[in-house]
Design a protein with these regions (language model features):
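Short internal beta-strands
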Residues: 54-59
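Active-site-proximal specificity loops/subdomain of glycosyltransferases
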Residues: 62-104
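A conserved hydrophobic helix/loop-capping motif in glycosyltransferases and polysaccharide synthases
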Residues: 25-31
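A glycosyltransferase accessory/donor-loop signature
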Residues: 1-23, 169-173, 186-334
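Conserved glycosyltransferase catalytic-site signature
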Residues: 38, 94, 98, 116, ...
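Conserved catalytic core of nucleotide-sugar-dependent glycosyltransferases
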Residues: 128-192, 196
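Short, acidic, metal-binding catalytic loop of nucleotide-sugar glycosyltransferases
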Residues: 44-52
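GT-A fold catalytic core of metal-dependent nucleotide-sugar glycosyltransferases
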Residues: 98-149
Length: 334
């Protein structure tokens, strides 16, 4: 189904009377330390899908008025959520992205982390006819598996411990995805249901992996689908280079001269999770993300100014890393 925003009057729905400002949109988010990265995410969204409205979830009190103006953002601050319980759950951690699920401005949205970029216009492939669209490439565990792979309890959940709370859930035959990119309907997982699972985790150490919202989101999507509570689908729309490789991305960038390529062979979300996609980190593949960072700065500073801005960002990041390492070393000597 074509992912097209339609003009409509704002409507009020949900328990907290949040106004829905568009039927569909992009959502991303950041804390203060990731602002320099989310600029690239926003630039990629605006470049490849200029008509799609964007919401920015902000975890903290830092200023984002420059981004709000540049990209015509709808800003959703975690600190301003009407529910104290929501604020406590989301503040200062990766669960901040859940603000869009319960208090966001779109009926249906595509989420991308601040270390991810839109890589081509993939809106033709977004399924607004389902409740949740998994952005992943394969079924992770065969339906007839007899052993639990060690990565499942590490990244997601321990099936044996989970069976105490949901004995009918089948952990096999599912696509376990990175929650750095997905699409879903607003309130696809009710808040009270989510908090119930959080209480399971509090009373059962090791039930869910230590990856913020990712373990619970995967559990809910697959368990609710199995029970027929939601309709979900899987589409190959998220590229994690450490998992999928980066040959396609390198081919796309080959003749782009540090600009967004005019032709993207396979549009999707390119997700640079793990090591931050810094220009001078030789252990991280970062060229597409650097292109998006440059695109953001070119909007204000031109070519030379864009490069200088990126280099200055890198200087601040590496200086911060050095300072933290030095402080840790001094702490060990004391």
């Amino acid at each position: 189904m074509r992912f097209i925003p339609r003009e409509r009057a704002a409507q009020t729905i949900g328990p907290c009377n949040v106004k829905i400002q568009a039927p569909v949109g992009f959502v991303t988010g950041c804390h203060a330390g990731d602002k320099f990265m989310v600029q690239a995410t926003l630039a990629s969204m605006k470049h490849f899908c200029p008509t799609i409205p964007i919401c920015l979830v902000v975890d903290g009190t830092f200023d984002v008025s420059d981004l709000e103006s540049e990209y015509e953002l709808i800003v959703l601050r975690v600190s301003e959520l009407p529910s104290k319980e929501m604020r406590k759950l989301m503040s200062g951690n990766g669960r901040a992205k859940l603000a869009a699920m319960w208090e966001g401005p779109f009926e249906f949205y595509v989420w991308a982390d601040s270390d991810a970029i839109v890589w081509g216009d993939f809106t033709q492939a977004v399924r607004t006819d389902v409740d949740f669209q998994v952005f992943w490439s394969e079924i992770s565990i065969p339906a007839d598996a007899t052993e639990v792979p060690p990565w499942l309890p590490h990244f997601y959940f321990d099936p044996q411990k989970l069976s105490r709370f949901d004995p009918e859930f089948d952990w096999r035959g599912n696509a376990y995805f990175s929650s750095g990119a997905f699409a879903c309907r607003r309130e696809v997982v009710p808040f009270d249901k989510w908090m119930e699972a959080e209480s399971w985790a509090n009373e059962t150490p090791g039930l869910f992996g230590d990856f913020y919202e990712q373990p619970l989101l995967n559990y809910f999507v697959h368990s609710m689908t199995q029970r027929g509570e939601i309709k979900s689908a899987m589409t190959n729309l998220q590229d994690v280079w450490r998992h999928h490789g980066f040959d396609e991305l390198k081919q796309d960038c080959a003749d782009s001269n540090w600009h967004f390529p005019k032709t993207i062979r396979r549009p999707r979300v390119a997700h640079f999770c793990g090591r931050k996609p810094l220009l001078f980190d030789w252990q991280a593949y970062s060229r597409p993300f650097t292109i998006a960072r440059l695109e953001h700065h070119r909007r204000q500073h031109g070519e030379l100014g864009a490069w200088l801005a990126v280099l200055n960002e890198e200087r601040r990041v590496w200086a911060g890393k050095f300072q933290r390492r030095l402080q840790r070393a001094i702490g060990k000597w004391k």
